[in-house]
Amino acid sequence: MTKPAVLLFALVMFFITNLVSANSQSKGEDKLSDLLRRATIGWNTDWSKHSIEYRELLSGGPPRDGIPPIDQPKFIDNQQAEQWLAPNDPVIALELNGDARAYPLQILTWHEIVNDTVGEIPITITFCPLCNSAIAFERHYQGTTYDFGTSGLLRHSDLVMYDRQTESLWQQFTGEAIVGAMTGEQLKMIPAGLIGFEQFQSAYPTGKVLSKETGYSRDYVRNPYPGYDDIHNNPFLFRDPVDKRLPAMARVVTISDGEYHNAYPVTLLEKFGVIHHQLGNQPMVVFSSSGSQQRFG
């Protein structure tokens, strides 16, 4: 019997798919730029270990944890969440060991990372507003539970996280450590979906929803990136050649098993509803479901 492929479903901008083909080998001598040095003063990162060129790391503006992760998340029930979430508001949804939780993008857009424990499993929920990628990871790795924060750096316009235990840098889109003591290590991805709040309610009537009581003063009903995902825009701080097969800001569903990587335009999924395809030699089906609007608008 063929072992099923491990699939990752993430709604992302098309340009970010170039990451999966990036050379992950050390580039040899590649000194930190003056800008990068200034952005990382006081860090205890082991800069002698890296699998990328340092010139690929760019400051997104805010300092480390200037976009604050949520470390002590509070949750409410579906009925309480109805007071401020519309039925089609997008949430990152997952279920582990019978524990179902939803993380509204209205909150994640402002924080990007939530360190949580779901079904007794330490996890981190991540969202990159620049590439619209929503990915969950198991954060207990080789006997250590890691806490993640925002580094303030970007690579290929994607969130670069750091762990507080070793201060290594991790690429959000792949879950791979790219700089520091953990370079080359890979976090385990956890199946999570980007769905509408009403869909979460229907599937998990007793599920929990991340509360707006985050400990930070943010206007969660306001989108801090209005118009960013206009199809005619260019990705922020993306300096590599853009794949011309689709507009750079086109939304796609990506599926990966670690070796093979497919991208499906959302417009195509909305048109056909179901697409039968293969990931490598593994047959697969991709479904489109209505009921969730896009966060940006």
What are these regions (language model features)?
Residues A22-G297:
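Mid-to-C-terminal functional-domain signal that highlights helix-capping/loop sites
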Residues L8-N18:
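Bacterial N-terminal signal peptides
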Residues M1-L8:
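Bacterial N-terminal signal peptides that target proteins for export
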